[in-house]
Amino acid sequence: YAAEYDLDPLLVYSFIRTESGFDPGATSSVDARGLMQMTEETFLWLRSKLGLGEEVSFGDLYDPDVSIRFGCYYLHLCLVRYNGDISTAAAAYHSGWGTVDALLQKEEHSEDGLTLSGFPYNQMHHYVEKITACYGVYTRLYGTP
């Protein structure tokens, strides 16, 4: 699915590592599920955007294929929305578009209104830091596509 959504597979691995530690049965405290840790609200929205019906259920996110398909699609949408900026897209993947859009309107968090330059929430800051650090390690180990 990385190729289908024009994503670097190493970036996808970074999200999977950060989100679930490669555990397909992972469930978070907010009931996000699967390798790429998706909430039901996000899953239902993406299922509709993908033109899929009830043949794919929220519980199917425990299937690695389903989780990676939906996670890659969502990551693709985040990267498109935030002009390819990995840190801003990661913040949106983690905290939602509404949160990131609101932060982009504040000068203390965005110098240009397009990318985040400051992360006001510790959890968001640590999440983005983990994604970028992991991606850096993977690209050093395996190169860039």
Protein language model features and the residues they cover:
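Catalytic glycan-binding domains that act on GlcNAc-containing polysaccharides
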Residues: Y1-P145
